[in-house]
A protein has these predicted regions:
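Acidic helix-start/capping segments at beta-turn-to-alpha-helix junctions
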Residues: 61-67, 129-139, 329
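Hydrophobic h-region of N-terminal signal peptides that target proteins for export
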Residues: 10-18
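Soluble metallo-hydrolase cores and metallopeptidase-like ectodomains found primarily
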Residues: 38-92
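Acidic/histidine-rich, surface-exposed loop or edge segments in extracytoplasmic proteins
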Residues: 20-31, 94-96, 168-169, 396-402
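Bacterial N-terminal signal peptides that target proteins for export
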Residues: 1-6
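Active-site-proximal beta-strand/loop segments in catalytic clefts of secreted hydrolases
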Residues: 59-61, 73-75, 96-98, 133-137, ...
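Hard-cation-handling environments
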Residues: 255-427
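Active-site/substrate-binding loop(s) of hydrolase catalytic cores
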Residues: 85-96, 103-262, 266-272
Length: 427
């Protein structure tokens, strides 16, 4: 009897300890620090070890030679692209740290992959295949300093830098493909063809009252039905679910002055940005921007909640999403063959027909205990609703008829053709 009790006590003591072994760097440091490259790799190796549905794979290397770890969550499937395509499941790609100072996406991804391993959110894998890339800008992630991202509220021991090792802002490189990191991302799009992509960021700038803001595609040449569904069905549902979880969310924007008054305005239509590039490929892009002036712990929490809400809804709407994408593909092919339609080549922001209620918030200044520099923190009691004009959509101001063919002079063909092939164009 004593021997049985002894082993029972040992087992009970071992189980909680083992469950606590796999913790993220923020969890181990009371949210003072973020994960370095070796931390992320070790975590993903541990979380996938022995799993029959979590598979660790690697994308091409960064400027400084770091391979990018990718976790594929696929139940009952070989994780190769062909098997995933044959499964008929909706493929969703979730990406963190394209700007390496914006680190909560990376940490939220690690937490969510661990939750999947532990049996949570199992319903996602009935309809979805999930591709998790916590750290796209791995070189920038290693340049951790408390002086990066001035005024951001943590992590107080520092975060990575915005550009990659060559000084390129990766979220401006989706057309030129000058960086190995974005080339690896576009290669992933071509191989796995995710229907939906999530790009997880931290805001800069305006003192608003939201925990997180979001955006879909903004280029008017994006398939209109995809854009309509995101504005009328998808984002309203996500906003509702986030409110139920206790988070204030809204469309991404900043305060600007236009025509002598304050307005809420979105950012850019340019395809060099991830959300616009993916949208122009007839896929569904989702941009997430956690508020820089809420604590690091809270930014991880709201980002993880946003991803959960998105994946829950996509699980419910997988058939509808696949239908929308198929229709967008057919529509694009028909337009190209007809030669009768046109595309926008110049664009302008459009003012909303009615004034919109936007949340504003004040911040207080706190001192970073490691650098001594000021950090801003949202004062929750200061959040208030203000009506103002909104600029959330672009319209074409100049359009050009779709060409039937392109002529490339020999002196530029050697540059242009490899770039088109890298994007997946059939030549």
């Amino acid at each position: 009897m004593r021997r049985v009790c002894f082993w029972a006590v040992c087992l009970l003591g071992w189980l909680p300890a083992r469950a606590q072994e796999l913790r993220t760097v923020p969890e181990r440091t009371d949210y003072e620090a973020t994960s370095r490259y070796e931390d992320v790799v070790a975590f993903l190796q541990a979380v996938t070890r022995g799993s029959d549905f979590l598979h660790l794979r690697w994308l091409d290397s960064t400027v400084e030679g770091r391979r990018l770890p990718l976790v594929i969550a696929a139940r009952g499937l070989d994780p190769d692209p062909q098997a995933i395509a044959r499964s008929g499941r909706l493929v969703v790609y979730i990406q963190g740290t394209i700007h390496a100072g914006e680190v909560e996406g990376k940490e939220a991804i690690l937490e969510l992959v661990r939750a999947l391993r532990d049996g949570k959110h199992a319903h996602w894998l009935n309809r979805l295949v999930l591709l998790w890339l916590p750290m796209l800008n791995a070189d920038g992630n290693e340049r951790i300093s408390p002086n990066n991202r001035p005024f951001q509220h943590g992590p107080v021991r520092g975060m990575g830098q915005r550009p990659n090792a060559r000084g390129l802002a990766l979220n401006r490189d989706h057309m030129k493909l000058e960086s190995p990191e974005i080339r690896a991302f576009v290669s992933l799009l071509r191989r796995y063809d995710p229907a939906v992509t999530l790009d997880l960021h931290t805001t800069n700038g305006s003192f608003h009252g939201y925990h997180l803001t979001y955006s879909g595609p903004l280029n008017p040449n994006t398939d209109p039905e995809l854009m309509r569904w995101m504005r009328q069905a998808f984002f309203p549902q996500i906003q509702h679910r986030m409110a139920q979880a206790g988070f204030r969310t809204y469309y991404y924007g900043n305060f600007e002055r236009r025509d002598g008054q304050e307005v809420w305005a979105t950012f850019s239509h340019e395809p060099r940005f991830n959300n616009n590039y993916v949208g122009l490929r007839n896929r569904i892009p989702i941009l997430s921007e956690a508020y820089a002036y809420i604590p690091f712990r809270d930014r991880i929490a709201v980002t993880a909640a946003f991803v959960r809400a998105v994946l829950d809804y996509l699980t419910e709407q997988a058939d509808r999403v696949q239908q929308l994408i198929q229709q967008a593909e057919q529509h694009a092919i028909a337009l190209g063959r007809s030669g009768r339609d046109s595309l926008g080549v110049r664009f302008a922001l459009v003012r909303s027909s009615e004034r919109t209620t936007i949340l504003k918030g004040a911040v207080r200044t706190e001192e970073n205990p490691y650098s001594g520099r000021p950090m801003y923190r949202l004062v929750e009691d200061s959040v208030r609703a203000v009506e103002m004009p909104e600029y959330q959509a672009f319209q074409a101001t100049i359009r050009e008829r779709l060409p039937r063919a392109y002529y490339l002079p020999p002196e530029v063909a050697s540059v242009v053709l490899p770039l088109l092939e890298a994007h997946g164009a059939r030549l």
